[in-house]
Amino acid sequence: SSLLRLQAAAITDAGVREIFRETENRIRSMALVHEKLYRSTNLARIDIADYLRSLADLLYRSSAITPEKVAIDVTGGDIYLEIDDAVPCGLIVNELLSNALKHAFPDDRAGRIDIRLAERDDGAISLTVQDDGVGLPAGFRMEAAGTLGLQLIQGLVQQIDGTIDVRRRNNGTEFGVVFHRKRGANAAAAHPDR
């Protein structure tokens, strides 16, 4: 990501520079998963709430928005994901947070973004990203979204065999993702209690 930052510094077009910044954030979100794994006592899984808090801090540092202007709160504990789920989950949250920070709070508007994680009774993981910003435009449909970020979200949700649903609120927007943990090669190590 440092190479992208160096390259972006030489670009004069603000739109192209923004594309480089978004790409750098995507790379950093993946690198952060690996950093959390290497620092943990279990190399097969990470505490996803802890990871998402670190990701929020990373996005603050790469934007002009401060925690005092837009608060980000991550709730949900004791949910551990192996890398096959953690990377796509992190990229989904990276895109949703980036979009909210960029579009939900125009004109120096203050607000908050809540990220909630929960394990449902059926064992599925529920991930909700909700903001109290200006909301989505009338007629917005996720499946018709033309931006790279929203297309990436849809592809990542498919990758984890999940579903996504978008709800317009009186104040803001709520994205809900539901998926089941992977039961791949690392499943036994990642979930010894199951």
Please give the residue ranges for each predicted region.
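Conserved short strand/loop->alpha-helix "switch" segment adjacent to the catalytic nucleotide/phosphoryl-transfer site
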Residues: T12, R21, L43-I46, A64-E95, ...
